[in-house]
Amino acid sequence: MSTARPRIITSKAPLLPQQTTPEQRYWRQYTSAQLVKEHNSVTHISFNPQHPHDFAVTSSTRVQIFSSRTRQVIKTFSRFKDVVYSASFRSDGKLLCAGDATGLVSVYDSYNPRTILLSINASTHPTHVTKFHTQDNKILATASDDRVTRLWDISNAYEPQLELTGATDYVRTLSFIPAAPHLVATGSYDGLIRLYDTRSSGSTPIYSLNHDQPVENVIAVSPTQIVSCGGNNFKVWDLTSNKKLYERGNFNKAVTCLDYVENFDSPMQSALIASSLDGHVKVFDPLDNFQVKFGWKFSGPVLSCAVSPSTAQGNRHLVAGLSSGLLAIRTKKKEKRSSDKENAPASFNKNAKSNNFQRMMRGSEYQGDQEHIIHNDKVRSQRRMRAFERNINQFKWSEALDNAFVPGMAKELTLTVLQELRKRGKVRVALYGRDESTLEPLLNWCLKGIEDVRSASIVADWVAVVLELYGNTLESSPVLQELMIDLKTKVRHEIHKSKEAQRIEGMLQLLTS
């Protein structure tokens, strides 16, 4: 019984193993993007610590609350007389505080923008930092351009409880140390991170850490470690030894914002998010020496970034604010949980019916579609043969070689033709009776293919036969002679690179052995 002639198998390069890491696959799930245009630069983003984790966006003279479910504005706080800064939630999510360029600090109900619960004249200078204490809900911290950080009791806010001085430039950030409610870390444009003990009556810092660049943000990642950013890097400090642990300079421009989150459904137990003026937002793993794991590129300088807190809902949103006024909201796609629906009790299933009803209605929707089974015995039309395949099947070796270099032919197909002719021992036959115009395409392809190690052996075999058959023709043709000179130069260059690679390999073996 006759069989169909087998097709020529296209030559394919070996596939590399999958290089994506579990961390990359997790952060790539933030695919659903929404862009919101604000009137001015988005300077601060804060998530509500309590469910459903709505987030406040500070821009120009207003603060907007976005719903974490719909990603739409649900509340707008616009009763500010000047540019507003750093709106943030209290730990219980019930209050929202913000400072403005006049120095006034306002405290609102988180979802009632009409009434101001408290107004504090913190300073006559712009108040850039306002933040509630993470454990004591009555304590509010503010930092203004008068280089003074103040702690207020909102139940009696006529005067500050404590004033923290010592900064010689603007204070732009502060952070409370977890598990140590009496410690406050501040960062200023004089390049120093100062640590204060609020239990002492004095207002001078316990000690200072030198960041060497104007400090934009300070955040605590553990009871003994804080991270500061400024310039094109961020630094990790150990509070027990007062020394720098790590320094990461993965950015080309100044790092503007830091955010620390814990992940319950991620390969990373925790993550440090950093944004920069170069338009990048990158993810670092604190448990892996703060190595970068993933990143996003935005259209402009990023001034603020935040990730929703990790609870039963998971880290659902990544929000970045740009200097152009663009707010980018990236949402992680939801996982399909079919097993939950299958395991749910019947009492919670609205469409569930009793067994008697199901037996009564059995077969009512059958339409006889399984009584007649039609077998399609038509022979599938095979893929159309290419020109070089037809010529090879018809033993037209020279024409098959010409078809390999037609314009638009893929490199893999050209390599397939050359390998097939070499496998069949028809290299000399395919090269007989050629002149300058028919040899030039082959030599041009060899000149490009010699750089690829996967096709170097094919190029060497074909060029050797060309030199053997057409040595005199190459000397008399200026075009072919120039191609051969270029090919010789490139071969020498590749040999030089191979020798250098072997030298480097030997050096690395000495270092690793």
Swiss-Prot record:
Interacts with snoRNA U3. Interacts with MPP10. Component of the ribosomal small subunit (SSU) processome composed of at least 40 protein subunits and snoRNA U3. In the absence of snoRNA3, forms a complex with other t-UTPs. This complex can associate with pre-18S ribosomal RNAs. Pfam families: UTP15_C, WD40. This is U3 small nucleolar RNA-associated protein 15. The lineage of its organism: Eukaryota, Fungi, Dikarya, Ascomycota, Saccharomycotina. WD repeats lie at residues 37-78, 79-118, 124-162, 166-206, 210-247, 250-294. GO terms for molecular function: U3 snoRNA binding. InterPro entries: U3_snoRNA-assocProt_15_C, WD40/YVTN_repeat-like_dom_sf, WD40_repeat_CS, WD40_repeat_dom_sf, WD40_rpt. Involved in nucleolar processing of pre-18S ribosomal RNA. Required for optimal pre-ribosomal RNA transcription by RNA polymerase I together with a subset of U3 proteins required for transcription (t-UTPs). SMART domains: WD40 (SM00320). GO terms for cellular component: 90S preribosome; nucleolus; nucleoplasm; rDNA heterochromatin; small-subunit processome; t-UTP complex. Keywords: Nucleus, Repeat, Ribonucleoprotein, Ribosome biogenesis, rRNA processing, Transcription, WD repeat. PROSITE patterns: WD_REPEATS_1, WD_REPEATS_2, WD_REPEATS_REGION. SUPFAM superfamilies: WD40 repeat-like (SSF50978). Residues 332-354 are annotated as: Disordered. It comes from Saccharomyces cerevisiae (strain ATCC 204508 / S288c) (Baker's yeast).
